[in-house]
C-alpha cells in the first residue's frame, strides 16, 4: 500500500510558494545539488548507444535511460524501485529524473564567472574597487596582483607585470610579499574583504566628499556591498571552484538516421571544459613548468567562459561547422530563449487551426466547427462517453471505434459538444477581443464558420484568414470561458467603450437603402393602420421602399421594474410620418427603444449609436438579439436593393476644367514673381503646393455636390433637389465602403502625390481614374502606392514592439481594492483647440467617479454627490446644467499600493459597469494603446499614396459672438500704416460671453496683424488676426535708422543670387559652416535715433539689438529708416511633409519612453523677473530674479528663440526658450498632473489625427507606471541610500514603518522613467529578465540576493501559477487566508498543548505521544 501511495506522491508536486529568491551558489551548494562528478568527456558508446560511465550522460550519476530498469538490465520493473544496482551503479527509478538530476565538475583551478566580470558594470570591479582591465589582466594570466604587501611599500591589490614581479622579488626578497595571478589571486582578494568595515568606510567617505562623481561612485559600490551583507552571499562565490553540469535530458543527444547524432552545443562546451580540466590536473600532478600550467589555466578559464556565455569575451568558440556554439546564456535570453519561447508562450494541446468562412445563419454566440476537427479535439470526452455507455471496454477499443467513425461516434460527439464552449483566436492577438469563446455547431466541410459581427473585434476578413480553436477542458475553464469570454458577453471595445458588434459593408448598405426617403415615391402620403398593412402594400408593389407614408406604430415604454428586476413595458400607439422601409424595419426594435431612433437614414455611425443606446437602455441580452436581427435584415435588404456600380456613376464635375486652368494661371503667376525675385524658391514651392491643394479640394467639393443631389419633380409638379440615389455616393455616405477621398480620385482629380520621403511633388495629377492617367501621371502615382506597402511591412513590427513594451511596464497593475479613499483628482474641462471643441466634456468624464460635488452653476445646489460614477444619464444632466469643469478621480492620484482601486479607475469600458476587483487594467491599457498602432500602420496604403496635407492656417476667426479680451502676455505695436502688429510670442485672444464666461481662446502668433481691439464686441465669424503662414517675420519694436553689425558677406551672411531671377538676398549662414574664428559672432542690427545715438530699451542702458537667426532672409538695407512694427527679416518655414501615423507611432513611442527632445525648450525654474546678463561667446545669458532676490542664470545658445523680453515676469515652469517640451522638466517644475496632461494630450493628438478613439484613462494608467519609482532625497531613519531609486510603494511602506516607531521618514522626488527603463527597473527580476537585457538583470539580482514576491502577472505565468488577476486573484486570496487560518490553528493547538503540559503525569504523556504517532 505504502509503495502505491509513494507512486502518487511522485506525480503531485503541488508545492505552494509565495516568493522566489535568486542568489549565488556556494561550492558546497553546487556539490549538494550534484549526484556525482563527471570525470570523462565521453558521451555515449557509439556501438551500444549506452552512456559511458562517469561521462556527460552517465546513467549512474543522472539516472536510468528506461523507466524502472538499470543499465545492465539486472533489475527491471516496479518491484525494485529505489534499488541501486551493484553492477552498474544505476538507481532503478523513472527516466525523467534525467531532466532534474545535476552533476558537477571539480575544477583543478578556480575560474571567474564571466557574468560578474564582463556584464557591465563589472560586479567584480565594484567589489574590489579595481578596473575591469586590471582584473582581466590578472584573470587571463598577464599580470600579478598583490595580496599581502607584508613589510614592503607595495599596496594591496596593486597590479604588476611579470617583469615587475621578478624585479620586486629580487629587490625585497622571495617571501616578503605575496602576489598571485589568475582567478586564485582574485579569489583571495575577495576572501580578504571585510564587508562591514568597507561599508562603514564608504559611508564615512560619502559624508565627507562633495564631488558629484565621487558620490555616485561610492553610492554604487555601497549598494553592492550592502546587498552582499544583507543577503549573506560571500563575494568569493563569484569565482567558481565547482562547475555544475546540466541534466542530460536538457542537452540531449539525438540519433539521426545514418548513425550520426545531433547534439546540443552545450555538450561540446562541457567536453572542452572537462578535457582542459583533466589535462590541468595531470599537469599539476606532474609538477609541470609554471608557464605551461599557466597557459592551461587560462584555457580552462576561457572554456568555462564560453560555456557560460559564449562570445562575451574574445572570439566565440565555434563548432565543426564554423558557427559559434550556443552557450547557457543564449539558452535563456532573446525571443528563442527559455523565457519567451517556453515559459511565456507555450504551444497547447487540444487546439487546431483552419481557414474561416462567413456563417451568416449563426447566432452571435455560435461558431461553425468542422466535424473532423471536433472529433479530434474532443477525443478524450468521446472516449470517456464510449466507456460509460459500455460500447468500448478499454481506451484502445474506444480509440478504434472513433477511428472507424461509426454513426454512434457522431451521436456521442453531438452530445459531448453541447454546452461545451470553444475558444477562437485570430493572430495577431492585439487586444482582449482577439480570443473569444463560442458554442460550436457541427458542420460539414473543413473551414470554421465565423459570425460576421465579431469580425471587427478579431479584425478578420474572409480572404483566406486562418483562426485557431482551443478547447477549455476543466469545468472551471469551461465556466470562465462561458461567463467571461463568450462572444455575446463582449460587445464593447475595452479601449473606448463603443460597441464592437457593429455591422459593416453590405449590411450597412442594406439598412441605409431601406431607411432612405425619396420625394414623390410611389404611394407617397398614404396612411396605414399598422405595420402588417405596410408590408402587404409593399409586397403588392403599391408603395416603394423609400416612399414617405404615415403609419400607426406601437412603441413600448419602460414603466418600472418588478420584484425580480424584470422590466415592465406599456404599449403606446402613435401615428408617425416615416417611410415604408423604416416602418418595416421597426418590427425588430427591442422593447424600451422609441421609434425615433430608427426614423432617420441609418449610416454606420448611426447604427453604432443605435446599438450603444440599446445596450444602455435594454441591457446585454436584448442588444445581442437586436444586433443579430439587424444583421439578418441588412443582408436580406441589401440583396433586395440590388445596388451595383457602373462607370457612369462616377460623375466628373463640369467645373473641373475651369478650376484647373485657374490654378495653372496662379502657378504661372508665382513663377513670374520668382523670376523677378519677389519670392524665394522655397516660398514659391510652398505656394504652388498650396494652390494645387486648394484646387484639388475645390474639384472634390464640386464633384461631391454634383453626386450628392439630384433634381426631381415633387407631387405638386415643382422641381426640387433631393439627396442622390447614386450608388457610389450611397456606398460612401452610408459608411459601407469607400470615402470622399477615394471618390475624389475616381471622379475628381487625384491631386498632389507624395514622394517616398514624405515631401510633396509639386505637379499634381489632374486626371482621375475615370478619365484615366497618362504614363507620367501613372509613374508619379506608383511612388506613393509602393511606399504605402513598404511602410506597412516595416511598421507592423515597430507597433508590435511598442505594445510589448507597454504590456511589460503595466502587467502588474491590477485593481486590488474597491476604494482607496483618496480626495485627490483632476479637474476635467472640454478640450478646446483654436476655438473648436475637439473633445466635449461629457466624453472626457463619462465613466469616471467624481471627487468633488458637482454644483448647479445657476442655483449653487449640489447636483451630483462626491463618489458617484458618472453614467450616460448623469453626463447628460451635467451637459444640461452647463457645468464646464468637473473634478474626477484618476488612476494617477490613486493611493492604493501595489495596484489600483476601482473608484479611481472608474468604469470598465468593456463591460459598461464599475470595474471589478482583480481586473488587469494595466494590460488592458497597454493593449488599447498598442492595438490601434498596428491598425494605423496597415491603414496607410488604402488611399494609394495621395498626399494628405494639413492646410496651413494664416488667419483666425471667432466662432462665437461676444467680447474680445487679450491675455496679459499679449503685446503689440502700431506700425506706420496704423495696423496692430503682435510682438509677443505667447499672446492669446479670448472671446467671452455676456456672463464673462470664456467661450474660446486663440493663440496669436508673433508678427501677426490684429484686426480687432481689446474689449471690442464682435459677431461670430469676424477675423481676429492674419499672418503669413509660410514665413516667420522679425519685427522691429522701435523706430530708428538701421545699423548692421557683423553682417559680413561670406562670413556671417551669404548673398544668394538666384540663378533664375538674377536678384540677390542676404541669407544668414549656419554657425557650424563658418570658420572657427567667426563661429562666435552673430549678425545683428542696432537702431540709431535722429542724433545718431543707439536707441536704448526704455528703463535700461541696454541698446536695442535684434539678432538674425540662421536661415533668415534680411529684408532691410543698412542705414534704412524703419518704423515700429516693420519687418526686418523673414525666416521661411520648412516645407510641409505629409502627416501620417509614421510621424505618429514613433511620436507615441517617444512620449512613453520619456525621451528628452534635442533642442528642448527651456522652462523657468522659478517665478520672477527676467533680465539679460553679459553675453558669453556663442551663448546669451538670461537671468531670472525670484521674489526673494536670488538670481538664477540660464545660458542659451544664440541661435535659439528667446520668448521673453527684459523685465518680463515669468511663472515657474513657463517656457522661456522655444522648443519642444521636455517631460522631465514638466514633472520637475509643474508636477504630476501637468505632466499627465501633457502626455495624454500629445498621445491623443496622434491618434485623433487618424480618427482612433482611446479613453484617456488608459494613457493615465501607463503614466502612473512610468512614475512608479522615486528618488530618495533625505534618508531620515529609513534603510535607503541617498539618491537611490526605489518603488514608490516600497518607500511609502518603509515610511509608515518608521513613523510608527516615531522616527523620521524619508523624503523623495518623483522620477519619470521611460517604459523600457521602467520595465527593467521593476522589483520583479523574473519579469525584467524576461523582457530585455536578461544577462544584466539576472547578474544584478543574483548579487543582490533579490527576492521576487510574484506580484505581477508575468512572473506568475513564468513560474506556472495562476495569475493574481481575475479569478486567480480570488484564488490566491482564499489560499492565503486558508494558510493564515491554518497557521493560527496550529499555533492555538501548540499553545493549548503548552498549557496542558504544565505538570504532566508520565502516563498521559506517553499516550499523547502515541496518539501523535498514529495521527
From Swiss-Prot:
It is an enzyme of class 2 (transferase). One of its GO terms (molecular function) is DNA-directed RNA polymerase activity. Mg(2+) binds at residues 461, 463, 465. The keyword Kinase does not apply. Coiled coil: none annotated. Its EC number is 2.7.7.6. The keyword Cytoplasm does not apply. InterPro entries: DNA-dir_RpoC_beta_prime (IPR045867), DNA-dir_RpoC_beta_prime_bact (IPR012754), RNA_pol_asu (IPR000722), RNA_pol_N (IPR006592), RNA_pol_Rpb1_1 (IPR007080), RNA_pol_Rpb1_3 (IPR007066), RNA_pol_Rpb1_3_sf (IPR042102), RNA_pol_Rpb1_4 (IPR007083). It catalyses: RNA(n) + a ribonucleoside 5'-triphosphate = RNA(n+1) + diphosphate. Residues 1382-1415 are annotated as: Disordered. Its cofactor is Mg(2+); Zn(2+). Keywords: DNA-directed RNA polymerase, Magnesium, Metal-binding, Nucleotidyltransferase, Transcription, Transferase, Zinc. Binds 1 Mg(2+) ion per subunit. Binds 2 Zn(2+) ions per subunit. PANTHER family: DNA-DIRECTED RNA POLYMERASE, DNA-DIRECTED RNA POLYMERASE SUBUNIT BETA. DNA-dependent RNA polymerase catalyzes the transcription of DNA into RNA using the four ribonucleoside triphosphates as substrates. The RNAP catalytic core consists of 2 alpha, 1 beta, 1 beta' and 1 omega subunit. When a sigma factor is associated with the core the holoenzyme is formed, which can initiate transcription. Belongs to the RNA polymerase beta' chain family. This is DNA-directed RNA polymerase subunit beta'.
